[in-house]
C-alpha cells in the first residue's frame, strides 16, 4: 500500500446510511476530478487483455499471462492516473492476469514494486460464486453472455449466489480492506458487470457494451458522505473477450 490511512476503512463501514447516487458511465478524468475534490475512489478494475480461455479449462485461465498489448495497456492506464493522489493501494484476484494488471498499473503510476495484495474474495472466491466447478459447467458450451444475462436479469443462476446479497457482501468486503484514497483492485468482468447491474448503474449489458479490458466499477466515497457508483470506461481497448 502507498500512502494509506488505516483509519479510513473503519470510517467507511461505519457510514451504512450514506446517501447513494447512481452516476452511470464516466471516464478516468472523472475519477481524477473526484480525487481532486477529496473523494475516495475504489476501482474494481477488469484486468487487461489476455489470450482466449479454452472451454475445457476448469481453472478459468488461472495461469494465462497478459498479452504484450495487454501489458502495454496497463502501463498506459497507470499513466492516466499518475500523480492524482499519493495515497494508493493495490489488490488483485490471485490469478496471474489480475496480479500482472495491478503490478503494471502501479508501474505506470510511477509506483513500480508497490505491494499487490492477493485476495480471492475479489476474484473467483468472491461472494458471487457458490461453486467454481458449477460455473465452469455453466459456461462450458460457450454461452457466457447468455448465462450472465440470465443471472443479472433474474438475480439467480446455477453456480452463483443470489445477485443482490452477493453484491452486498462483495462490496462490504472490498470496502473493509480499502484504506487509501485510491484503490485499484484488479478483478474479472463477471464481477464488474454483476456489481454494476445490481447497483443500477447499467442494467442492459450485452456483448456490445460489456466491460472492456481495464474498464471498472467505481465506488466513490465523497467527503460529505455521499456514495456514488460509476462505470468507468478506460477507452483503451475495444475488446470484450480474449484474443486468439
Language-model segments: which ranges?
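Short helix/loop capping segments that flank catalytic or ligand/cofactor-binding pockets
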Residues: 53, 121, 194-195
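Active-site-proximal alpha-helix that buttresses catalytic centers in soluble enzyme cores
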Residues: 2-118, 149, 154-160, 204-222
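Low-complexity, serine/threonine/proline-enriched polar segments
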Residues: 115-116, 120-158
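Histidine-centered active-site/metal-ligand motif
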Residues: 47, 188, 237
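Short, solvent-exposed aromatic-acidic interface loops
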Residues: 231-241
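Short aromatic-enriched loop/helix-cap "lid" or pocket-rim segments at secondary-structure transitions
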Residues: 54-58, 103, 127-133, 197-198
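Active-site-adjacent alpha-helix immediately C-terminal to a catalytic or transition-state-stabilizing loop
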Residues: 35, 165-229
Amino acid at each position: 500500500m502507498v500512502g494509506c490511512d488505516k483509519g479510513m476503512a473503519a470510517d467507511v463501514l461505519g457510514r451504512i446510511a450514506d446517501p447513494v447516487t447512481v452516476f452511470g458511465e464516466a471516464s478516468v478524468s472523472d475519477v481524477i476530478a473526484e480525487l481532486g475534490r477529496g473523494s475516495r475512489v475504489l476501482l474494481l478494475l477488469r484486468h487487461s487483455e489476455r489470450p482466449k480461455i479454452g472451454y475445457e479449462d476448469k481453472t478459468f485461465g488461472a495461469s494465462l499471462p497478459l498479452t504484450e498489448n495487454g501489458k502495454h495497456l496497463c502501463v498506459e492506464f497507470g499513466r492516466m492516473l499518475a500523480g492524482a493522489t499519493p495515497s494508493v493501494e493495490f489488490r488483485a484476484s490471485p490469478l496471474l492476469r489480475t496480479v500482472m494488471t495491478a503490478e503494471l498499473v502501479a508501474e505506470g503510476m510511477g509506483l513500480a514494486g508497490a505491494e499487490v495484495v492477493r485476495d480471492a474474495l475479489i476474484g473467483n472466491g468472491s461472494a458471487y460464486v457458490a461453486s467454481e466447478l458449477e460455473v465452469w459447467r455453466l459456461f462450458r458450451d460457450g454461452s457466457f453472455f447468455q448465462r450472465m444475462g440470465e443471472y443479472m436479469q433474474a438475480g439467480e443462476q446455477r453456480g452463483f449466489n443470489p445477485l443482490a446479497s452477493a453484491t452486498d457482501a462483495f462490496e462490504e468486503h472490498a470496502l473493509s480492506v480499502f484504506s487509501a484514497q485510491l484503490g485499484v483492485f484488479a478483478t474479472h468482468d463477471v464481477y464488474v458487470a454483476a456489481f454494476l447491474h445490481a447497483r443500477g448503474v447499467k442494467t442492459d449489458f450485452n456483448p456490445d457494451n460489456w466491460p472492456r479490458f481495464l474498464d471498472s466499477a467505481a465506488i466513490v466515497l465523497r467527503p460529505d458522505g455521499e456514495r456514488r457508483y460509476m462505470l468507468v470506461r478506460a477507452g483503451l481497448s475495444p475488446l470484450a473477450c480474449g484474443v486468439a
